[in-house]
């Protein structure tokens, strides 16, 4: 008050910019029609089920890392989800893969069981695509 700064104090800096991540969401289906999923253990979306969710990379590279052999691939589309402190820019890909052992931390989930899993809203675009094109045909 005494320095004439009542209009500028207290100084509030704006909110921190949100961290942005580019993610590959992979709906991997084996020859038995099961979808590869895992239950998240990270703090973000803890205990919710998700499809393969990796930093953006070529699909074949992602499958190689999981020990899976691709038979066919289709682009699903892109989506974005804004969390309180992070933004996911997601690129969805469907891949038909040969039957293979389950990669560590993942499960092959029969299509009829997917709707019984707790899935994050962030992946709803890809769940809708799967519902329309894979498990409700």
Feature locations, PLM:
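Intrinsically disordered, low-complexity, charged terminal extensions of DNA damage-control enzymes
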Residues: 1-137
């Amino acid at each position: 008050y005494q320095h004439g700064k009542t209009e500028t104090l207290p100084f509030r800096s704006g909110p921190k910019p949100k961290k942005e991540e580019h993610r590959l969401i992979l709906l991997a289906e084996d020859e038995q029609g099961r979808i590869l999923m895992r239950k998240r253990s990270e703090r973000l979306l803890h205990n919710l089920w998700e499809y393969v969710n990796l930093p953006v990379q070529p699909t074949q590279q992602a499958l190689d890392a999981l020990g899976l052999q691709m038979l066919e691939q289709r682009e699903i589309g892109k989506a974005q989800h804004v969390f309180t402190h992070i933004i996911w820019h997601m690129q969805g890909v469907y891949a038909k893969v040969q039957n293979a052992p389950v990669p560590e931390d993942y499960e092959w989930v029969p299509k009829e069981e997917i709707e019984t899993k707790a899935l994050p809203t962030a992946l709803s675009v890809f769940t809708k695509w799967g519902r329309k094109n894979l498990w409700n045909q």
